């Protein structure tokens, strides 16, 4: 059968962008987006709006290989741009609105962004970030919000902005032929996992990977046609785990949400019949702890990832009516690629046993290829006994192409045919994966990744500081919070207090990165080679118990 080969008829590039075109045909009159009191669109309208924006981008010179950035919460425009930007041929770069101006500036410069869409309430952040750039700044486009008080921007007062989002829609061609990828390996999204000035980690994904991840997520979560999806997960977190494209594929309704508000979420669940939502474990905690947490009148599926929810939170949320699924993924995999596939026989187990099983991350999703845990020295698979730890490695279609402008980092992560996550875990005898420790330099607090190295770098700029190490401290509400262990220089007058160190950090980094605990030590513990033993400090932080500081 040597003559049987791929051809143009059987190998067109896979892309998730085509899901929107199909949704407009199949679900044209169905509701695609709901936001606030008055904003409602159908799938036909959403498709036309996206085509208009893509057309306008093309007309002002945006095209293949250009990076277009977006600084916005989960508004209708943010959802539309997940399609409209790639439709113009450009590469989509969502930026976390919780970052400070300095970090945003670093990311814009690193990716050489050609255009930046800015939510009206992030205008000051964007203008400050652009003012710090030493290279050509991106074209600025402001996105108004008629549903929010003060959300309609007066363009006359925004001299640094070239267009409004509505301008692009009005001037765009609804008959625009969107630009399909020449290859399914063409980049489609760029997401940053870290904003350090020395080495921003920009993760690049291709059309093929996002297509596979989108479909895989629908299958694994058993999402039916016409679901109602509530956007509690920020889209700037790894493109909302590819759900913008997946929900289009099944003709669902996107209930957009500017910011997390537990009472509002319960009202939206009731008013719109929400069936699905995602978020970090802190979302479960906030929903189950609020006074509004009355039993739901219908089940709501929640997918959470990262550190497992505490058993008490899990049981409380389930008693309200939430059906909880737990998984594991990274920015480098574009979404959840390991899920705790639930077995019916486990339903009859005691609550404590169910919580223990749900705390495990699970098995690979059906569309992913392989997951393993290997010995870091030999590279061989560890014994599947739930006790022998090793590094989690994986391979599958949704693994990133690599890190932007970082060939060394890419080569280190993608080697021997595997993606090396840096996370530590075990595999149980039944084949289920359980994480024992996230990547040693990453702290996950309220769903946000914090680079301990970046926090340490800031603390080292304080003249009185001799040594510093930042680790995760367990927190029942946030999951983890940064905990800084500090030794001060001998003979240094005016030694800083715990609060003074925290205040210094608040001026240098986003609020979520600031250490919530500072512990002074005469000397940090070290190995025989003189390296700080962070595992000792993690154990100390764990024994401190939970602590929450808002």
UniProtKB/Swiss-Prot annotation:
UniProt note on tissues of expression: Expressed at low levels in roots, leaves, stems and developing seeds.
Single annotated GO MF: ligase activity
Database matches in InterPro entries: AMP-bd_C, AMP-bd_C_sf, AMP-binding_CS, AMP-dep_synth/lig_dom, ANL_N_sf
Keyword Ligase: yes
TM annotation in the entry: none
Lipid metabolism is among the record's keywords: yes
EC class: ligase
GO terms classed as biological process: fatty acid metabolic process
EC number: 6.2.1.-
Keywords: Fatty acid metabolism, Ligase, Lipid metabolism
Superkingdom per UniProt: Eukaryota
Family: Belongs to the ATP-dependent AMP-binding enzyme family.
Function: May act as an acid--thiol ligase that activates carboxylic acids by forming acyl-CoAs.
NCBIfam families linked to this entry: PRK08162.1
Protein name: Probable acyl-activating enzyme 6
Organism: Arabidopsis thaliana (Mouse-ear cress)
